[in-house]
Amino acid sequence: MSDDEQERTIAEDLVVTKYKMGGDIANQALRLVVEAAKPGVSVVSLCEKGDAYIMAETGKVFKKEKEMKKGIAFPTSVSVNNCVCHFSPLKSDPDYTLKDGDLVKIDLGVHVDGFIANVAHSFIVGVCKENPITGRKADVIKSAHLCAEAALRLVKPGNQNTQVTEAWNKIAQSFKCSPIEGMLSHQLKQHVIDGEKTIIQNPSDQQRKDHEKAEFEVHEVYAVDVLISTGEGKARDGGLRTTIYKRDPSKQYGLKMKTSRTFFSEVERRFDAMPFTLRTLESVE
């Protein structure tokens, strides 16, 4: 966005419509993936299912607007048990097959003209009325749910981001759980998934000192990420390679190799500044 271009917000009816369209598609994609997440189903197949649905459905809206960008704002990720988030493996990576009792976290995002709708859901495979969740898995899911409910009430004009952080800590502690240290929820803007204003979870002393306090304002949009653990809340490297990347529009670098330039132009054309998975580029030469 250029300096003389006015930022578009939900003060515009058309912007609200685009958010709603993205939200409807995101919720339908999430429902589709959750329903397909049965014992014996592979994580890769679920990720592919979610992404394919998003691309198909976003292709049906604003068809006359040929230049409008729309599609995946965050690749479908299926993170199981102690994997915190954003697990979206390549076809060539070791896959994981779901089984009864797995705690599954699904997250994905959709955008229409750069206006982003992110959704997520956590559940236990094989759970039903006759086979309810109990114990620590029940504690952590209930804690996360109440934290999300608290955020819905606290993220409003005039409140501070620190109020949300404090509420999450209190709720998690009441279930003997911990928010994952240092995880951020970001303000969303057109074509920007990681806006300047953030809400931090369970900050360390240094993070608390460094994190910028902010007040929520009218017409702002936020993606609220709630990540709760039955452990101490400190994420560790699981040894898996990164598969989700994002182009940084603020960085400029002259690529020397032809293959690098081809790859970069494909990323720019298809994803702009949205996160993408290498899985969708496995055929790029």
What are the language-model segments listed below?
Residues 1-285:
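Active-site neighborhoods and metal-handling regions in enzymes and metal-associated proteins
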